[in-house]
Amino acid sequence: MKRNVLLFISLCVVGCVMTYAQQMPGLLQKGKADTQDCKAWVDEQLSEMSLKEKIGQLFIHTVTPLQTQRNKNNIYAAIKEYKVGGLLFSGGQLSDQVLLTNYAQSLAEVPLLITFDGEWGLAMRLKGTPRFPRNRVLGCIQDNELLYEYGKEVARQCKEIGVQINFAPVADVDVNPRNPVINTRSFGGDPRNVAQKVVAYARGLEDGGVLSVCKHFPGHGDTEVDSHKALPVLNFDRARLDSIELFPFKEAVKAGLGGM
């Protein structure tokens, strides 16, 4: 059964990938640092930076991937004037994101971190890319190995367009039907199942070479406020938080995952 499911998913993905790959311009490779030299390279870069440049490295600038002169001017200013450490592309066309990534990397003295908010893959933000089910559907899968393979496939697609960090997976436990913003973004209402899915998917991302970021700490599943518009409050005692909201995040920490 597992083999049949994987075959079905693979066929769907291949069909979609062939379509979007034909539209995608080549990615400008900046080079890959040798693992043993990474720390020395980072120390050397930091030693040559001004205070302004060091501060800029802490910021990720949001860009809409549209090939416009205004967008290019925006990227130019973010990199040359404010010395940002990375970019977050959100929405638009796949080909535009790749072209703007190449443009941005060509401007940067220090290679940029290119980030993405793709909880269920590239299609969450980019048109014409492979579509996967929402997390609520994936939370019903009993074989967590499939979630791991799914994470690796999302990582592969991210790397093809130069993305190194994916702000996923959602580790919130959806236990409030009045929640206006989480819902199907969550793997479900069982903390243990959510934790298992989060760890499997995030491990797949990271084994595929893309940093995962579990969110939204300390838990956004039992709120009735959209945090994009106001500040949610969790009015629960520590025992409740440990057993539900914090449980998936603790499991992610135990698993040694890279981001939160």
Q: Model-flagged regions — what are they?
A:
Residues G56-Q57, K83-G85, E109-L112, V163-Q164, ...:
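Short, well-ordered coil/turn segments that N-cap beta-strands
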Residues K197-A200, G204:
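Metal-dependent enolase-superfamily TIM-barrel catalytic cores that perform enediolate-based chemistry
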Residues D34-L66, N71:
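Mature N-terminal segment immediately following signal peptide/propeptide cleavage
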Residues T64-V194, H216, G221-N235:
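Enzymes and membrane/adaptor proteins characterized by extended Gly/Ser/Thr/Asp/Glu-rich
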Residues G204-V213, S227, R240, I244-G259:
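Phosphate/pyrophosphate-binding betaalpha-module
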Residues M1-G26:
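Bacterial Sec-dependent N-terminal signal peptides
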Residues T19-W41:
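Mature N-terminal, pre-catalytic/accessory segment of carbohydrate-active enzymes
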